[in-house]
Amino acid sequence: MIGGGKTNSGVAVSEFSALRLPVVYACVNRISNPIALFPLKMYRTRPQGGKELVQQGTGRGQHPFASRIGVRPNDLMSSRTVRKTCQAHALLWGNGYVEIERNGRNQGLGLYPLLPDRTAPVRENGDHWFRTTIDGRRHDLDPDNVIHIMDQSQDGFVGISQIAMAREAVAMGLAMETFGAKFFANEAKSGGFLMHPGRLGPNAQRNLTKPNGEKVSNPENPASRLDDQGGLENAHRIKVLEEGMKFVQTTIPPEDAQFLGSREFQIAEIARIFDVPLILLQSHEKTTSWGSGIEQLMIGFIRSTVEPWVDAWEQELNWKLFTDEEKEQGFYVKFNMNALLRGDMKTRADFYQKIFSVGGFSPNRILQLEDEDPIGPEGDEHFVPANMTTLRRASDPNFQPDPNAPSALREDDPDEIEADARAERDAA
């Protein structure tokens, strides 16, 4: 944690105060939401190849945490809440921590997020563990029982906080928020000065007030109040000088005219830290960096920004959640990102048609990718050309295709199909 120290702009910045800046809040949301949205399921590799979905249970090939990991990893929180909370911690503090609850057989049974400002990895005398504080009590946790999601790191043990790295940029954003708010609180006027050729008399000194209307505590030295009337906290307020007063209206300098432009630049500066495209932050940017549409931009965002975080989650979960025996049996968890990466309907239909026609995907596999129910065991067959027969029949030398069978996924002329069938019969 940065500790909320002052920056060059005079604004204190911490991970908590940074969230008050809309662009920071939006960036954290844009990255955390997909992590929380992707289905998270437990699988087991088959000895003969492929994979199978692990069922909830305690029998062979089953796991007591199989269905709960993607739905309810603990009794208090949904899977979405746990993942979004920990991911937000990693984005703000640079480190997200989740404690693994285990049963007597050392199997993972629950996941509980830990506060990042009260948790840290510890290394002493060659040993490594995590130290956390819960309800005022300190606990030392085995490193195998803590999922540690971190961003860039200098030593490989502690992640670097993005807010710490961008504290000046965040502080400028907060300062401009306050500056603009004060401007409108002062009736959208930039204020002015009361000037006098002499010194303030005793009565005028006693009548000096602070910006909030409170009487000045030391009227004998009115000049001491001048410093307190400046700064960001008192932006746009009227400044009191010496006696012989006259009011001088200040004009808006050219720099003030660039206020909106400065705010846009600051949004872009912070978005770069989190690697989020401006268009996803409802910015005024009119062009995209990937392709010509929002779909390609979203795919690029998932690939370049979200997928590295998904990989960090999968590596930590697969290494620490399972026992050595479960790892040998092929247990693993995986995020399903197909929902946001599979493209539009036309693109998917073209892809499925091509890969189906060469025996790559079965009908059930295509339905699975579309989150639809399978059509039954017959949908597991793979098909190849020659009137789209199955691979088993195509490999049988005694099998003769039916020339009257419909040619699936083809748009050939019917006369050409009949001619092809006649040629096959003549050759036989």
Regions found by a protein language model. Give the residues of each.
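Short flexible/disordered coil segments
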Residues: 113-114, 129, 300-311, 344-357, ...
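Active-site-proximal structural scaffolding
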Residues: 91, 187, 215, 219, ...
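Short leucine-rich amphipathic alpha-helical surface patches
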Residues: 310, 317, 321, 325, ...
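Non-transmembrane, aqueous-exposed alpha-helical and coiled segments at domain scale
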Residues: 324, 329, 333, 337-351, ...
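A short pocket-lining beta-strand/turn micro-motif at the edge of beta-sheets
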Residues: 309, 313, 329-333, 362
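Short acidic alpha-helical/loop segments enriched in Asp/Glu that coordinate divalent cations
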Residues: 278-289, 315-329
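Structured, contiguous alpha/beta core segments that scaffold functional sites
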Residues: 1-259, 263-265, 269-272, 276, ...
